[in-house]
Amino acid sequence: MQLKIRNLSKTYANGVVALDRVTLTIPAGMFGLLGPNGAGKSTLMRILATLQECDAGSVFLDDIDVLDEKDAVRRMLGYLPQDFGVYPKVTAYDLLDHFAQLKGLSHRARRREVVDGLLQQTNLWDVRAQRLGTFSGGMRQRFGIAQALLGDPRLIIVDEPTAGLDPQERVRFHNLLSDIGEERTVLLSTHIVSDVADLCANMAIINKGQVLLCGEPQELIYGIEDFIWARFVTKAELPAFQARHSVISSRLLSGRTLIHVYAEDDPGEGFEPARASLDDVYFATIAGRHNPAAGNC
């Protein structure tokens, strides 16, 4: 199954351009949409989830017109929004059972089989009788995935699913998404580079409503590996280096500041070639330093 987005645009009433002629082809498997907050990711997710209208463009899920055939899309869609509410005094089992009825699973035995299976798949079986108000953030996100999987959707959209999760819950959630992505098209929207690096076979970087880069993560890393240089500097030296070089990132490492710069030639001043990562691709692209053709997105 393939999702084709062509020249999708959206401008809000206050003049903010959320999407500017976005064009993407999203194949089966895990696809990462990576960008900072305010890049237009959530607007795109809501349009694809048939919750918001666009101004122009087209979206096709195989041969289904997503913008015109919303009911058909909803029958094969699972959606986990960035923010979603639950009934805090209802148990996980009862609420998932209720959602299953709303999805059309009216036969009690079949519904029980589906609900039981999803709670086990999301590692919530042992807490199925707990009220949702007692769940941690990670448990709530896994419950969100369980409801998104009702109806065996072919397309799943998850918007910023790991924001706010502790490292252990993030690993658990990554494993869950990885299993799901083996059988479906999963569109993952995030500002966390490691989410895409760990999970996605294909990705795109979006900022200010425009797709800047797309491709396979490892291929994008290969495309930048000759241009990344690194060295340690003191905190006092950092502003001067930022003025003289295209510094794309800085971070503390063992109490010292490690900077990465983007340069086509040796920048001198003690810089050494650095092994490029997806972080370098992301930061250089967002900063406007790395501008290859977007290609056939």
What are these regions (language model features)?
Residues 49:
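Helix-to-loop junction immediately C-terminal to a conserved catalytic motif
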